[in-house]
Amino acid sequence: MTDVTIPTERGPMPAHLATPAGPGPWPGVVVIHDALGMSRDIRAQADWLAGEGFLAVAPDLFHGSRRSTCLFSLFRGWVPRGDLDAARNWLADRRDCTGRIGVIGFCMGGGFALAVASDHDFAAASVNYGGLTKEVERALPRACPIVGSFGTKDRWPGVREVPDRLEPILTAANIDHDIERYPNVGHGFMNDHDPGDLSIVDRTIAKVVAARYDEPATRDARARIAAFFRRHLGDAPPASDGPGAAT
C-alpha cells in the first residue's frame, strides 16, 4: 500500500493505492469514500479489495477544498465526475492493470458510484447504501452491471427505498445486477470508522440514521462484491498473501 498523486483538472489529487500480492496485471477498482473523506476505513476498503486480487485506488475527493465546502456542494447536486474519470484513467494507464475497471462507493460515495455507473466506462459498480437522484435514475438504462448492498433499518432519507427503485429499471434494461437488503442493519454497516475520525456532529448523525458497523453483513457483502467484480472485470483470483506494496 502506498500514497500516490493523480493529476486532475482541479489539481493534484492524493490517493491511496493498494496492490495485490503476486504477479499482475490485475483488474482495477476505484474506491469512493463516504462523507468523512479519506480515513483509515477507506484505506482498509481498498486493502481488502487488493487482498481479493484487484488493483484498488481510493482518491481523496475533497482535495483542495474544505470538507464542509464539498458537503455543501453535495446538497446542490455535486458529483466529482472529472476526478473519478481521472482516477479510472490513471488506473487503466498502468502496466499492472488489465484496463477493466470497476467502481465501489459507500454512503455519499455509493451515490457517486451510481452516478458514474452510466456513461463513464466502468465495467461494474458496487453501490453501498448510496442515494439515487432523479437525474441518475434517468441514466440507469445505460448503466454497467451493479451490485448493491442496503440495510433494512437505514434511516438516511430516501436510501432505504433505493433498492426498490433500482431493481425494476435494471431488470427492464437487461442489466446484470445483484441487490441485497440486509435485515436489522442500518446505514454505513460496512464502514468501521475510528471514533477519532468522527466529530460530535458526525456521531449525532450516525445515531439518527442508525449507522453502525456490522461484521456478519459486511462479510457477506464483501463476498458478493468480490464475486460480482470477478465476473465482470475478469480473472482476479484471491491473493492468499494479502495486499502487497505498490511501486
Spans of model-derived segments:
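Conserved alpha/beta-hydrolase "acid-adjacent" motif
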Residues: 155-163
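Primarily recognizes the serine-hydrolase "nucleophile elbow" in alpha/beta-hydrolase
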Residues: 86-143
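Hydrophobic residues in well-ordered beta-strands that form the structural core
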Residues: 57-59, 127, 148
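Serine-hydrolase catalytic machinery in alpha/beta-hydrolase-like enzymes
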Residues: 3-96, 193-212
